[in-house]
């Protein structure tokens, strides 16, 4: 059975919600799915004072586990147009896997969130995708089979490079049903692609 890892970092819960939607989509395709997060680097007192969501159910991933999956779908909120340092720090530890070619041929994808419509969604996706390409992975985005990314009647995320959500400047906007549908769609397509490639 196809094994999929949804790997994420979420400070305020928006990416956590998107990760769970991605996982739902991958499960719809018949995959076995694990949802894991990367370690928090912000000191506890600072995270609490900043109202980080610290009660996330997903277990902490270990870098050596990445080799166990047919597909890895990575999500993180943006930090000035690039992935959050927590995710970058985690992926930077994959040098041993890269050197052994342990991730070559696996399927990868990316999803993100920004505070505003023009807050760096696509550049953040590119920073994730660049890492995955260096690992030797085959990238699957959010293709236009998901027509919801072309909606003009509401504020919505979505890009051919990956599922996205817009949180609002104060973080009060949760992922919309359309954005969650995009995440589920991408998860399903990635799982289907991994099944075709890895059986």
UniProtKB/Swiss-Prot annotation:
Domain of life of the organism encoding this protein: Bacteria
Domain Flavodoxin-like, residue spans: 4-190
Residues that coordinate or bind substrate: 98
Sites where the protein binds NAD(+): 12
GO molecular function: flavin adenine dinucleotide binding; FMN binding; NAD binding; NADH:ubiquinone reductase (non-electrogenic) activity; NADP binding; NADPH dehydrogenase (quinone) activity
Claim: Cytoplasm is one of the keywords in the record: no
Gene3D superfamilies found in the cross-reference section: 3.40.50.360
Classification via Pfam families: FMN_red
Textual note on the cofactor: Binds 1 FMN per monomer.
Gene Ontology cellular component list: membrane
Keyword match NAD: yes
PROSITE patterns in the record: FLAVODOXIN_LIKE
Positions that bind FMN: 10-15, 78-80, 113-119, 134
Reactions that this protein is recorded to catalyse: a quinone + NADH + H(+) = a quinol + NAD(+); a quinone + NADPH + H(+) = a quinol + NADP(+)
Keywords, in A-Z order: Flavoprotein, FMN, NAD, NADP, Nucleotide-binding, Oxidoreductase
Annotated TM spans: none
Top EC class for this record: oxidoreductase
Family: Belongs to the WrbA family.
Protein name as annotated: NAD(P)H dehydrogenase (quinone)
Natural source organism: Bradyrhizobium sp. (strain BTAi1 / ATCC BAA-1182)
Source taxonomy: Bacteria, Pseudomonadati, Pseudomonadota, Alphaproteobacteria, Hyphomicrobiales
């Amino acid at each position: 059975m196809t094994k999929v890892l949804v790997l994420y970092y979420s400070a305020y819960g928006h990416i956590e919600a998107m990760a769970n939607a991605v996982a739902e989509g991958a499960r719809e395709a018949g995959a076995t799915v694990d949802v894991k997060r990367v370690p928090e680097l912000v000191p506890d007192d600072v995270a609490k004072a900043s109202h980080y969501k610290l009660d996330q159910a997903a277990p902490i991933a270990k870098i050596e586990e990445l080799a166990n999956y047919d597909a890895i779908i990575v999500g993180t909120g943006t930090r000035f147009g690039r992935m959050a340092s927590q995710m970058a720090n985690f992926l930077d530890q994959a040098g041993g896997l890269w050197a052994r070619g342990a991730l070559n041929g696996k399927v990868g994808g990316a999803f993100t969130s920004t505070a505003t419509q023009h807050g760096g969604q696509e550049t953040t996706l590119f920073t994730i995708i660049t890492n995955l390409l260096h690992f030797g992975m085959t990238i699957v985005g959010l293709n236009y089979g998901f027509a919801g990314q072309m909606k003009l009647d509401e504020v919505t995320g979505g890009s051919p490079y990956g599922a996205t959500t817009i949180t609002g400047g104060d973080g009060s906007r949760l992922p919309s049903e359309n954005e969650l549908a995009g995440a589920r769609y991408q998860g399903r397509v990635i799982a289907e692609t991994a099944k075709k490639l890895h059986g």
